[in-house]
Amino acid sequence: MPRQLLLRRIRRVVAIAALLGSVATPVLAQAAPAAKAGESCSKSQVNKKSGSLTCTYSAKTKNYTWVAAAASTTSKKNWPSKLVVAAVPSENVATMTLRYKNFVDVIQKETGVPTTFISATDYAGVIEAQVAGRADIVFYGPFSYVLAKARGAKIEAIGASVPTATTAQGYYLSYLVSKKSNTSINALKDVKGKNVCFVDAASTSGFLYPTAGLLKEGIQSTEYSSVFAGGHDKSVLAVQAGTCDAGFVYDDMFDILLPQRGLINAADFKVVWKSGQIPNSPMAVRKDLPSDLFEIIKKTILEKINKTSFVSMGLCTNEATCNVIEDATWGFKSVTDARYDDVRQVCEATKSSRCR
């Protein structure tokens, strides 16, 4: 074979081999740069990990950032095998259990302790559960919280419910409602000789403040027939059914919740009395829990149990439809026991045996 032809063939083979080599050898994709603690991340990345970092949303700063998992400073020594969340009954048990699902899930996630929700059939049952140490975290009414403390519950009010993120302290009202068609009841004094629905003997807006209002009008409990409905919703529904001539209820239950659910037509009712401002309800935690666990629960309730955080965690699609514990609650703001001294003063004014 001529030398030149041989050289051309050798060059062709070398070229083909080089081409095949470049195809066969994969080009390594350049790795994405690792996230650094404190750097910004996005809403779509929340709760996702990059190495040892997690994309976290802060309701305080309203920023998404990569955060390193804190080194465990707790041994979890003497921690309970489970946590129990409870609440005084404002509605039926099934509805309340559903409403507290996200709350329970977040407490369980942040503490790592299996968490369940219970709702007793009356306020006394919830108070007794926390006095006996069978309930760890309880959402009380102001009066039932005062009663629990007075009866020996080792608890601390760590947060009170607020309707918006910008509300420092919230208040609510007690209403007395009657059917519009009932022309005999147009004011608080008109309950004489009538069947009156209260909620529970340990309810703030469903008993204590109404009782104080009646006494201020000079009306004694012997001058009307008391019916304890067992829930704020049940009080209004009993008026609707004609079981009671009038009933006491907290404002948002009547103004928002019952109409939203189609259970009443507000136009069929009239509000014949409103109380003064009542400090919003507290979330109380057992002080005899291990201190490190107590602090985790407190931090979680104040920073992560709110509509803004629930949306960022993917538990809600938006704040407008998000439920924390009830539709009217955005979340919780720090509170102290002294905030409920007004409730204690109302108790003193009524001289009611229920206050003991």
Where do the protein language model's features map onto the residues?
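Short beta-strand-to-loop elements that line the ligand-binding cleft
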Residues: 114-121, 137-139, 222-231, 270-273
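Extracellular disulfide-bonded cysteine-rich modules/repeats
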Residues: 49-57
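An extracytoplasmic/periplasmic, membrane-proximal ligand-sensing/linker region
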Residues: 77-86, 91-102, 285-356
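Secreted/surface-exposed cysteine- and glycine-rich disulfide frameworks
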Residues: 32-43
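Secretory targeting and sorting signals
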Residues: 1-31
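A ligand-binding cleft/hinge motif common to bilobed small-molecule-binding domains
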Residues: 139-153, 212-216, 240-241, 245-266
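Bilobed "Venus flytrap"/periplasmic-binding protein-like clamshell domains
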Residues: 85-108, 120, 143, 166-237, ...
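Short beta-strand->loop
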Residues: 155-169, 222-225, 258-277
